[in-house]
Amino acid sequence: MFKNDEEYFADKEYISNSMIGDYLKSPAYYEAKHVSKIIPKQSSPAMVLGLALDCMLTEGLNVFGMTYSKQCLKRDNPELFEQNKTGAFEVLTEAAWNQIHTMAGLIEELPLYKEIKDKADKQVILTGQFGTGYKVKGKLDFLVVENDTAYIYDLKTSSVIKPIQYHYHCLDYGYYRQMAMYKNLVIQNYKVKKVVCKHIVINKDPWWNKCSVFTLNEDRIDKEMNTITDTIRNINAKAFDEVFEEHEIGEEKEASTFGLKEIDLL
C-alpha cells in the first residue's frame, strides 16, 4: 500500500490515530493541518528523539546511519560538517545523539526486547476499515503473531515511568486509542482471536534512564472504539466547526480506572 514513510505520512485518505488526536484537539486545527494544509509539519525535540530511537531499534544501525547524523563544528570534523549541510540527514545535537545511543543500549538489555527482536515483524504498516467503510491506517513498531494470538509492542519515550502516572500519560497522549486502532487493524489483517498490547517505555531524563514494560488493559483499550468511530465519522462529514466546551474538574478517580500493569523493570 505505502512504499515508504513519506507516502504513509503524506497520505490523507486513510485516517491514523495521530490524525484523530489532531481532530480531538480541535476540529478547526485538524482542518488547517490536514485539509487546508496551512499548518506546516513540525517536529518537537521529543518527537525527533522518539523517531530516532525507533529507527535505531526497529530498522537497525545501518538505516539509522543513513538517516541521522551528529552535529559538529567544522574545525572538529570538516567532512561531517559539510555532509550535514547537504540536507540528506536529520542532524541531531551531540546531546541527543548520545542520549539515543544510551537509551537504545538499555532497551537492548531488556529481557523482553531480547526475546522479540529477532522474531518480530518491525515497522509494520497496516490498513483497514472502521465502521461503514472508513479507511484507517497504523504503523506498529513490533508485531509477533503466534497461533491465534498477536502481540503488539510499541516503543515509547516518556518523562514519567511509574504505573499510575503513566496511565494518565497514556490518556493525555491517546495511547489507549492508538492501541485500539492497532488492535482492530491486526484483527482485520491476521487470523487471530486475541491481541495483547504492550509498551516498552524508557524515560527521557538525560542523566538517568530506566526502562519499564507495561501491558495495556484490554477493556480500557476497547473503550476507545466509540471515540474512534465517532471521530472518523465527523472527519468524513467535514464537521470542522469549533465546539465550545465547559467542564467540571477535581473529581478523584478510583484506582480501578487504571488501565495498565507494570510487568518488567530495568
Which residues are covered by each model-predicted region?
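Non-catalytic protein-protein interaction segments used by genome-maintenance enzymes to assemble
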Residues: 125-176
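Metal-dependent nuclease catalytic cores that hydrolyze phosphodiester bonds in DNA/RNA
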Residues: 1-138, 246-249, 253
